[in-house]
Amino acid sequence: LLTTPQNIRYFTGYDSQFWESPTRPWFVVVPLSGKPIAIVPEIGESEFQKTWLDEIKSWTSPRPEDEGITLLKSTLENIKKTFGQIGAEFGKEMTIRMPVRDLFKLKETVNTNLVDGSDAIWDIRMIKTEEEIKRIKFICSIASDAYNSLPSKLSIGDTEREAVNKLKIDILNRGADSVPFMPGISGVGGVSQIVCGPTNRTLNDGDILFIDTGSTFDGYFCDFDRNFAFGKASSEVEKVYEVLWQATEIGINAAIPGATTFDVFNAMNKVISEM
């Protein structure tokens, strides 16, 4: 049972800006064999019919007293089960995009067990296809190119917000679909946090500007940051930069088939710890 936009898009190809609204839940049931089944609010039915799915069920929504739960319950009860259980997005880095009240109601009334199915989703999604790799490579490439060209667009006196917007516009112009994540923070010699901002703080001589981005193309993200020095960077900043550069190079060399993320982390962390 899938309810989140990311997993529904992965298994069906369906994407919608309407997911920004929390009013309506959307459901996709992936059986052990055969095509997925969509149970969606009426407003999304026509577009779902353009996907590769054959079975699309809908209900008139908003309808707070029954937002698709009756339809979902009957679907779950009628599909063939081998082990008498249905997996759901209950595990790590997963959420259920439906009212918790409705989830409790579903668990109490459906004649099958709802269990954590996140391991199955992880096992499938961790292995990328060639088409997925192409999309990830594309969004990472254009973000990297935009980062590389940003210094020519920045100057002392700009604000954090102005600097971030210049990067965001460039990434979009290069072909990204959206830039949902781009914190920008600055400070003398470095920054104290990397999750908030930007603000209207003015960039001055000696400042370090940190910008991170999670930009997307066709549902796939890049996720990396860059630091920019304004005026003259201190010797301490230059030393830290050199260590991080070396750690990154070692991490790239450690990222080989068969290695784990733990292996890559340890290789990089060893360099940083010895700083």
Indicate where each model-derived feature is located.
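Active-site neighborhoods and metal-handling regions in enzymes and metal-associated proteins
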Residues: L1-M275
